[in-house]
UniProtKB/Swiss-Prot annotation:
Observed effect of gene inactivation: Inactivation does not abolish EsxA secretion, EsxA-specific immunogenicity and enhanced virulence.
Biotech and industrial use: PPE68 is recognized by antigen-specific T-cell lines from HLA-heterogeneous subjects. Peptide P9 is an immunodominant and HLA-DR promiscuous peptide of PPE68 (amino acids 121-145), and may be exploited as a peptide-based vaccine candidate against tuberculosis and other mycobacterial diseases.
Organism from which the protein derives: Mycobacterium tuberculosis (strain ATCC 25618 / H37Rv)
One GO cellular component, as annotated: plasma membrane
Protein name as it appears in the record: PPE family immunomodulator PPE68
Record's keyword terms, sorted: Cell membrane, Cell wall, Membrane, Secreted, Virulence
Main location: secreted
Region (Disordered): 255-280, 312-368
An example Gene Ontology biological process: response to host immune response
Composition skew (Low complexity), residue ranges: 312-327
Pfam families: PPE
Function: Plays a major role in RD1-associated pathogenesis, and may contribute to the establishment and maintenance of M.tuberculosis infection. Together with PE35, stimulates the secretion of IL-10 and MCP-1 from human macrophages, via the interaction with human Toll-like receptor 2 (TLR2). Stimulates high levels of gamma interferon secretion in peripheral blood mononuclear cells isolated from tuberculosis patients, as well as from healthy tuberculin purified protein derivative-positive donors. Does not interfere with the secretion and immunogenicity of EsxA (ESAT-6) and EsxB (CFP-10).
Subunit structure: Homodimer. Interacts with PE35. PE35/PPE68 complex interacts with human TLR2. Interacts in vitro with EspG1, EccA1 and EsxB.
Length: 368
């Protein structure tokens, strides 16, 4: 900028219009604080790395220390640059103060103008010619050049103090290949049994693997209910018996019960004997004993005699037309119908014998 083309009062006014040296001094203090903090971090990191090297030895330790050592160098470099900028800010404040002291002040310039005006007004018969020339010389030569020179020096020092060295960012401590592979967690690891990392596959293969990985999620969601049903059937099969081909191995509850079963819970009518011949405890499930059918007894225990005798044996002493056992409302002790002889009833000893057989049968089942 052509400072010599401007009057001294304009140059001085431009210089005085700034914020002064206070911002530069504050910036210098901030850079000094940052430099001290970086130095402390560098010292602490160096101590930590030394302790790590003593506690951890081997190839991995050497690689870790070699990767972390540049961090210490970067901290030290940044601290040095912070100190340099603090010095530059301090020098800028000093340059401003020097420029303000060198340039003519506005009151001095104003006094020159006032003196010039008075001498010109009182210049009768040329008596003030020499004082007027000296006043003009002081303004145009000394003040003008002094103000311009002060601004030129201040501009040059400002250019030097604002020229900062570029601070390079800290380099990554990871290898370039490792940092690139970690960006994709799916393809960053090689598959088991493969000698080539997945990250080095062609782009087409990588894209295909990505599509397969995206499709595996919905397929797992679709097959999850089927897996639950399969596990349920496996549990039922394990409980029902070890050999699925053997239909008579065991039965779980009433599953697999024969349609010809006489068990009441399976849809049967219960024992063929009437209610008058057996006690309530002798019916399956009516007493405190464990409910069991003859089929279950044959499958689990040794074969036993059936608890109910054939109906033909009970009716051997009765003539044709006699009512079967248990047909009447009162059991075997009831009177016969119109087609039988008057007063003909079922033999009482037979009913007592059937009751004792049933009780013995259920007692054996209770022991089980």
């Amino acid at each position: 900028m052509l400072w010599h083309a401007m009057p001294p009062e304009l140059n001085t006014a431009r210089l005085m219009a700034g914020a002064g040296p206070a911002p530069m001094l504050a910036a210098a203090a901030g850079w000094q604080t940052l430099s001290a903090a970086l130095d402390a971090q560098a010292v602490e990191l160096t101590a930590r790395l030394n302790s790590l090297g003593e506690a951890w030895t081997g190839g991995g330790s050497d690689k870790a220390l070699a990767a972390a050592t540049p961090m210490v160098v970067w901290l030290q470099t940044a601290s040095t640059q912070a100190k340099t900028r603090a010095m530059q800010a301090t020098a800028q404040a000093a340059a401003y103060t020097q420029a303000m002291a060198t340039t003519p002040s506005l009151p001095e310039i104003a006094a020159n103008h006032i003196t010039q005006a008075v001498l010109t007004a009182t210049n009768f018969f040329g008596i003030n010619t020499i004082p007027i020339a000296l006043t003009e010389m002081d303004y145009f030569i000394r003040m003008w050049n002094q103000a311009a020179l002060a601004m030129e020096v201040y501009q040059a020092e400002t250019a030097v103090n604002t020229l900062f060295e570029k601070l390079e960012p800290m380099a990554s401590i990871l290898d370039p290949g490792a940092s690139q592979s970690t960006t994709n967690p799916i393809f960053g690891m090689p598959s088991p049994g493969s000698s080539t990392p997945v990250g080095q596959l062609p782009p087409a293969a990588t894209q295909t693997l990505g599509q397969l990985g995206e499709m595996s999620g919905p397929m797992q969601q679709l097959t999850q209910p089927l897996q639950q049903v399969t596990s349920l059937f496996s549990q039922v099969g394990g409980t029902g018996g070890g050999n699925p081909a053997d239909e008579e191995a065991a039965q779980m509850g009433l599953l697999g019960t024969s349609p010809l079963s006489n068990h009441p819970l399976a849809g049967g009518s219960g024992p063929s004997a009437g209610a008058g011949l057996l006690r309530a405890e002798s019916l399956p499930g009516a007493g405190g004993s464990l409910t069991r059918t003859p089929l279950m007894s044959q499958l689990i225990e040794k074969p036993v005699a059936p608890s109910v005798m054939p109906a033909a044996a009970a009716g051997s002493s009765a003539t044709g037309g006699a009512a079967p056992v248990g047909a009447g409302a009162m059991g075997q002790g009831a009177q016969s119908g119109g087609s039988t002889r008057p007063g003909l009833v079922a033999p009482a000893p037979l009913a007592q014998e059937r009751e004792e057989d049933d009780e013995d049968d259920w007692d054996e089942e209770d022991d089980w």
